[in-house]
Structures are given as structure tokens and as C-alpha cells.
Amino acid sequence: AGVPVCLMHWRTLQEGAFGSAAGSADHGGDVVRDVHETLERLANNALAAGVRSDNIVLDPGLGFAKTPQDNWALLKALPEFLDAEFPMLVGASRKRFLAAIREDRGVESSPLLADPATAAVTAISAQMGAWGVRVHEVDVSRDAVDVAAAWNAGAAYTGGEHASGSYANGADGGT
């Protein structure tokens, strides 16, 4: 089939049940392995159904039935996911585990106040080679990606040129 598809990990407590994205599910003690294996199975199912491999994008499902620790483990393992055959989408925008960064400091927290943390995750994900990111505040995240690109370019950065696209692996930040 010629239609692009994004396959996201979302394990529920009951097979076939769709509920709240909050909370956690049993990932067999290793969320990274569980997400890898599930996304691989989903991709193989899509290929078997006739979806072309160049139309498949994978998403680890940050925040969907995962604890904050699960989400951080998945972000730390992002390079492992990027070694896979398919492009990776990182959807961390305004997730509770990012808002919790502020709570840990004892300051006001809300999903809206997680935009700076979202921008940081966006810039790091783009720098690592993520195919794309899902964000609410495009300008803030775009600035973060462009700052990281300028930083990496150093003296080669010419200020007036668009910085995106300069990362290894050809990522453009997807914002």
C-alpha cells in the first residue's frame, strides 16, 4: 500500500482494551526490550499486509501506559531504536514525565509548563537522528533544534542559513 503509517507501542493491561494513556502496563521487566519486540512485530505485520517499508514510521509511545522511569529508559535507549530499519518518531510533547521535572524542583508544574523540557527532548532527539518529533509549540522546539545545529556546526554555522538538516543520519528535526 502507498499510504504512510505510524506504528506506536501502547501496551494495555488487557489485550485489545483501549483505555487511558496514563498509568503503566506490564512490560516484562524490560520496557526497552518490550517496545523493541512489539514495534518489530507491528512492522512485520504491516509489511505482510502490503505496506511498503519506506512508508513505515515507528513510535515508542512515550507516556502511553508507561511510568516516568519507562519513558526515560526509552529516551536513553533512543540510539538503539534509531539503528532499526525504520524511521523513529518521538512524541514527548507536554507529557507528564516532562512536567515532573519541574515538580522535582518544587516549582509550579503543568503540561503547558513542560514546553521548555519538550524543546530539550526535541533538540536531543533530532541531534541523535530521530526522523521526526511531535510537539505542541513548534517555534520553541524549532529554535532548540536550530540552536543545537548551530552549536554542532561551530564556526561553520553562517547564521543566516537554515540550520535544520545538519545532523548525522539526515534528521531534520521533524518540527
PLM features: what roles do these ranges have?
Residues 62:
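Acidic/histidine-rich catalytic cores of soluble enzymes
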Residues 1-45, 49, 65-162, 167-175:
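Active-site-adjacent loop and "lid" segments of alpha/beta metabolic enzymes
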Residues 53-55:
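Short acidic capping loops at alpha-helix termini that bridge into adjacent secondary structure
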